[in-house]
Amino acid sequence: MARLIFLGPPGAGKGTQAVVVAEQLQLAHISTGELLRAAVTAQTPLGIEAKGYMDRGELVPDSLVLGLVRDRLQQPDTANGWILDGFPRNRSQAEALNLLLTEINQQVDRAVNLDVPDPVIIERMLARGRADDTESVIRRRLEVYREQTAPLIDFFRDRQQLLAIDGNSEVAAVTDRLVSALQVAA
């Protein structure tokens, strides 16, 4: 069993690795973005509330996201473990997640940080060809990451939960490196 959080800058390959590793290790892949979209589509009480924020272009409050995460972590398919992708994004979310996990008798086993140099990230994201992925937008997203999310590396390192992985390779090579490191760390 493994309960994992995937960290790293935008374009590092978190989502890609989360899907592949979850499949290989038979873990539930939990994407907060997908949780939000599914709750809105299903018109759950949390989804209806979240939709109001999303329609106004506002960030969905942490309390709503945590409610969705709490519900998802208690589903039967998470019994063998899970990978949380896209959450937490800052220290206060990480602290709230730790409290939530304590309440439901779970804990994070490892926070995996995919380390990729900025020039590689910029190249990867430009290659995706998305309209909103201009170099200036990508650089701004990296700044926001450094300000808000990068401090989580120290947060999880201080708790001896951090697993740093070189993400500057082809997808399969990073996956192999990651799965091997998780097996050693288990």
Swiss-Prot record:
SUPFAM superfamilies: P-loop containing nucleoside triphosphate hydrolases. The keyword Lyase does not apply. Pathway: Purine metabolism; AMP biosynthesis via salvage pathway; AMP from ADP: step 1/1. It comes from the Bacteria. AMP binds at T32, R37, E58, L59, V60, G86, F87, P88, R89, Q93, R130, R141. Keywords: ATP-binding, Cytoplasm, Kinase, Nucleotide biosynthesis, Nucleotide-binding, Transferase. Consists of three domains, a large central CORE domain and two small peripheral domains, NMPbind and LID, which undergo movements during catalysis. The LID domain closes over the site of phosphoryl transfer upon ATP binding. Assembling and dissambling the active center during each catalytic cycle provides an effective means to prevent ATP hydrolysis. This is Adenylate kinase. The gene is adk.
